[in-house]
Amino acid sequence: MIFAQEKFVDQGQGKWTVTIQDDQWTEFLKKAKNRLKTNLVVPGFRKGKAPESETAKYLTPIKIYNEAFKIVVKPAFDFALSQENKIQNDNSPTPVIVKVSDKEIVIDFIFDLVLELKVGEYKNITTVKKPVVEVNQEDVDNVIDMYRSRFAMQKEKQADDQIQKGDIVTFDFKGYVDDQAFEGGEAKDFVLEIGSNQFVPGFEDSMIGLKVGENQEINVKFPEEYIPSLAGKDAKFVLNIKNIKEKILPAKDDELVKDLNLPDITTYEQLEQKVKEDVLEQKTKISKSEFVENIIDEIIKTSEFQIPKTIIERQIKDVKKEFEDQLAQQKITLDKYKEITKITQEEIDEELKSDAIHRIKSFLVASEIKNKENIVASEEAINAKFEEFANLYGIEADKIKSLIDNQAIKHQVESELLETFIFENNGN
């Protein structure tokens, strides 16, 4: 017997190849033929007693090859196991006939690779710049304006008054693409705050200056990142302005603070400071997560992976389900999506596979770093996280513990610890 082996890392599989030739294979063919003859029933003869001239009519080469394969597959597999295997299998290999004739048989034993990871350098990576987070006055004003909106008064404008940013407008609209009305592009008595960016870019700005009673056409372009059926297309909207109300916000003073009734905040200056701190915390959290994702991408580049096919297929299935759910939410069929985007099923499958493999690699790298650095959530940290949720939702900690699984909290705490570790040990 002759042994060979090959690894297909991109497919998550390997194979052992065993070749049986010449006299050795001839012996297996004889055994197969004799076994078949023993159980062969030929009309006019007792079972297994027909002469060679008669059995030859029934025992075709294909039948003999198949029977010989059944006999040889176990010794061939045992032979493969006895060799110096540099490729370890993660499941029971599947035997496949590659080639068969009177002279030889070639059998492949195909199997999933064992999951392996050799993680690259994960400290002192300087190819990604550490973010600098700043909070400006506009950031603070935007949050405070949201607070002010809670207590805003609305005053109806006069007939000749024009729409301005911040106004509340009631109107009818109907949209057209290529002079054809499109689904979801029409509404009656729609209420919109101008400047809320609720509509596509340019829509609300085009309404500024219009008056009650005006029937006006406006032109916009849908963003490239939009519902596929409308993405990047020019559109026309016919508007009928019915009512305009001015939103009158309360002053930025201590009276606003009283109305908000926030804990430990009694003056407007304290409110501004608290908002600034909250915005800084939020921005820092977002930029930190983005930085860590970029660092993990860098670690992946220098790491070596061997991922079993079954794991890849399982992740592809999950990613595909997410993709299909997104299309369903947008009420678009897969065929329609392909028609709009001009991409093939093969391209979609390749993209989903690439996404799936990247997710697996990111998870493996994160898990390996966590193990190497012994990042484990302490009981104190877990309890502190429960307290954090309790304060957030205004529920007692014991009640929160009955609602949220302890393992889920442990996982979240460890994820945060890992993120902090990667953040503190990388960047410039």
UniProtKB/Swiss-Prot annotation:
State its location(s): Cytoplasm
Record domain PPIase FKBP-type: where: 166-250
Enzyme class, broadest EC rank? isomerase
The EC number of this protein is 5.2.1.8
Q: Tell me one GO molecular function of this protein.
A: peptidyl-prolyl cis-trans isomerase activity
Task: Kindly state one GO CC term assigned in the UniProt record.
Answer: cytoplasm
Q: Which SUPFAM superfamilies match?
A: FKBP-like, Triger factor/SurA peptide-binding domain-like, Trigger factor ribosome-binding domain
The yes or no answer to whether the keyword Isomerase is present is yes
Q: Which InterPro entries match?
A: PPIase_dom_sf, PPIase_FKBP_dom, Trig_fac, Trigger_fac_C, Trigger_fac_C_sf, Trigger_fac_ribosome-bd_bac, Trigger_fac_ribosome-bd_sf, Trigger_fact/SurA_dom_sf
GO biological process, any: cell division
Going by the UniProt record, its keywords in alphabetical order are: Cell cycle, Cell division, Chaperone, Cytoplasm, Isomerase, Rotamase
Its catalytic activity?
[protein]-peptidylproline (omega=180) = [protein]-peptidylproline (omega=0)
General function of this protein: Involved in protein export. Acts as a chaperone by maintaining the newly synthesized protein in an open conformation. Functions as a peptidyl-prolyl cis-trans isomerase.
The text of the family note is: Belongs to the FKBP-type PPIase family. Tig subfamily.
* NCBIfam families referenced in this protein's UniProt entry, alphabetically: tig
Q: Domain description from the entry?
A: Consists of 3 domains; the N-terminus binds the ribosome, the middle domain has PPIase activity, while the C-terminus has intrinsic chaperone activity on its own.
Protein name per UniProt? Trigger factor
> Which species is listed as the source?
Mycoplasma mycoides subsp. mycoides SC (strain CCUG 32753 / NCTC 10114 / PG1)
Q: Its gene?
A: tig
